Amino acid sequence: MNIKGSPWKGSLLLLLVSNLLLCQSVAPLPICPGGAARCQVTLRDLFDRAVVLSHYIHNLSSEMFSEFDKRYTHGRGFITKAINSCHTSSLATPEDKEQAQQMNQKDFLSLIVSILRSWNEPLYHLVTEVRGMQEAPEAILSKAVEIEEQTKRLLEGMELIVSQVHPETKENEIYPVWSGLPSLQMADEESRLSAYYNLLHCLRRDSHKIDNYLKLLKCRIIHNNNC
């Protein structure tokens, strides 16, 4: 089939590039290369790029959690302490696809933005604290740095999406505040490692939620639920 000049060409190229990025764990292109103030990207493309970026962040979060778990937490039983102890647990989030589909579109977008904003501070301190560790594992540090950077980009992209879908929406600065820094700095190694485990567990959980939520929203807004 000759796709030259076909309307499928752009979509096919985007799919190929997206798959290549995910397989190679290479950072996706910026959601809006010219910056938010001069963004000329269509809503469809904004969603396409946001979905690729959120999936990339979730993959990195899962890999970082697995590496930390294998290196530091074998047999310590941290998982029992991590359940329901995330700083974002106060947010009312859909528990399954059915609940998500019933959620108001505007509230759904605001929820994603709130989750992303709530991770700005913990990701900054995660990078700072891991960098200061003796014999800091490079695999974990490099992923933490990348996740922090890409989460900021995803937040910028989501703010652009909100401005296009609901231009009347005022910026909402209300989001859960993280207070876990003292726990990452504890002198007791067991307590400190437990705090790191909890933070990485929550990051993996929330990045998975955002990844799923964005796919559902893209289906609803771009494809009118026909996907």
Curated annotation (Swiss-Prot):
Listed CDD domains: prolactin_like
GO cellular component: endosome lumen; extracellular region; extracellular space
Main location: secreted
Subcellular localization: Secreted
S-S bridge residues: 32-39, 86-202, 219-227
Glycosylation sites: 59
GO molecular function annotations of the record: hormone activity; prolactin receptor binding
Signal peptide: 1-28
Modified residues (Phosphoserine): 54, 62, 118, 163, 194
UniProt keyword terms in alphabetical order: Disulfide bond, Glycoprotein, Hormone, Lactation, Phosphoprotein, Secreted, Signal
Entry's Gene Ontology BP terms: cell surface receptor signaling pathway; female pregnancy; lactation; mammary gland development; negative regulation of angiogenesis; negative regulation of endothelial cell proliferation; positive regulation of canonical NF-kappaB signal transduction; positive regulation of lactation
Effect after changing residue 157 to D/F/L/N/R/V/Y: Inhibits signaling via PRLR; mutant PRL acts as a PRLR antagonist
Function: Prolactin acts primarily on the mammary gland by promoting lactation.
Record text on subunit structure and interactions: Interacts with PRLR.
Record-stated family: Belongs to the somatotropin/prolactin family.
This protein's name: Prolactin
Organism of this sequence: Homo sapiens (Human)
